[in-house]
From Swiss-Prot:
Belongs to the PAPS reductase family. CysH subfamily. It is an enzyme of class 1 (oxidoreductase). GO terms for biological process: cysteine biosynthetic process; hydrogen sulfide biosynthetic process; sulfate assimilation, phosphoadenylyl sulfate reduction by phosphoadenylyl-sulfate reductase (thioredoxin). Keywords: Cytoplasm, Iron, Iron-sulfur, Metal-binding, Oxidoreductase. InterPro entries: APS_reductase, PAPS/APS_Rdtase, PAPS_reduct_dom, Rossmann-like_a/b/a_fold. GO terms for cellular component: cytoplasm. The gene is cysH. The lineage of its organism: Bacteria, Pseudomonadati, Pseudomonadota, Alphaproteobacteria, Hyphomicrobiales. This is Adenosine 5'-phosphosulfate reductase. Coiled coil: none annotated. The active site is at 241 (nucleophile). It is found in: Cytoplasm. One of its GO terms (molecular function) is adenylyl-sulfate reductase (thioredoxin) activity. Catalyzes the formation of sulfite from adenosine 5'-phosphosulfate (APS) using thioredoxin as an electron donor. Binds 1 [4Fe-4S] cluster per subunit.
Amino acid sequence: MEIPDVTMTINSTNASADTASLDATLAGLDLAGRLSFVAGLGGRAVFTTSLGIEDQVITAAIGTHRLPIDVVTLETGRLFKETVDLIDETEERFGIEIRRFRPEQDDIDAYAAKYGLNGFYESVEARHACCHVRKLIPLGKALEGAAFWITGLRRGQSGNRAATPFAEFDAERNLIKINALADWDIEQIRAYVAEENIPVNPLHQRGYPSIGCEPCTRAIKPGEPERAGRWWWENDEKRECGLHVAGAEQTPPVSAIPQR
């Protein structure tokens, strides 16, 4: 694994140039090289895992190479049991801690009072509000003090993600987002998992290529896009939880969150 001898300082003033340079550098590296390079730039690096097959590949690389990258997950309170069980299995397998960030019960109660516990089925606004409470607020806490946010986004996951770069500046959170697997397709992912014997969510074998909260995820049909089972009752262009959508952090839908 050959890592370029490059020192970079990422700052908001030169964000576009810094990010473009970093994107070009990462394009020439393999997965372990990309993660090692980012870990060596200085500043806290955080990887958010949903325990999906892509994220398991990144977690395996972090654990195998003992990289100084914090691994965190958003335990929304509505995950599949298989996903929750995989957290412990993954920690044990790779000797790492996956730190869990959970929503506040007061926020959940306020959401339920406004929309109903399962109100996300009734409107896009209600679904976005649920994701805001269960994902976006915990994500903000997970990324506090981070300079780099590593994700498992891939270009092949959906049309919305077809232009995913290796590095992009997140102005709302004032950090650099690193999409370390942007150019991997699902066949590369599966081959790597098989070669390295990486534990994966058993739901993948039951027709769930993309796994989120249990009430909002279904198995897909043959020929459907990988993320077709996420919020399947909505139009494709709206099928994002807000974690990777510009503007979602600062301008959420009508809030169900109480003022404190």
